[in-house]
Amino acid sequence: MNDREPNQKESKESVNDAVPRARKVDDQQLRVSKIRDGTVIDHLTAGEALNVLAILGIDGSSGEGVSVGMNVISDRLGRKDIVKVEDRELSQSEVDVLAVIAPEATINIIRDYAVVDKKRIERPTAVTGLLFCPNRNCITNANEPINTRFIVLDEGLQCDYCGSIVRESEVPTYLDVA
């Protein structure tokens, strides 16, 4: 009879028959498509891609296309995240922020589908003007024309003026990126 409702098994089979099957993704195939021009931020710690986008203020509202691959298999890291931002190259201050929050990252500049510049970010010894000091009494928080300066430590950053510590997990809270 045609008036009866199909059972779940029949329903799945008919849906599967109607939808073209996707090609199997093998180890050599890209999971995220190539971009013509822009920046690829590779080798991010797994689970950090969305934090990196938020910290850098990249949300696609400026018109750039943004692709994110999360928890992708990596020979070097085991698992990693990757971010592709079309039609935009990171400024030096954005690269400096990345160096603090994602020191293992690699930045690739893409032009006409080719990598024209590839650099591995290295953690700096100090950063200037990127963070607010958490100490309200620090000279950098007064109405003085002084840029903050933090010494980069293994566990975070230390204010060069008052000695306050910003732990690595707290860095996003104190970022001062325009």
From Swiss-Prot:
Gene3D superfamilies per record: Aspartate carbamoyltransferase regulatory subunit, C-terminal domain, Aspartate carbamoyltransferase regulatory subunit, N-terminal domain
Record-given protein name: Aspartate carbamoyltransferase regulatory chain
Cofactor dependency: Zn(2+)
Top-level lineage group: Archaea
Organism: Haloquadratum walsbyi (strain DSM 16790 / HBSQ001)
The entry's keywords: Metal-binding, Pyrimidine biosynthesis, Zinc
Ranges for region Disordered: 1-23
A GO molecular function held by the record: metal ion binding
Purpose: Involved in allosteric regulation of aspartate carbamoyltransferase.
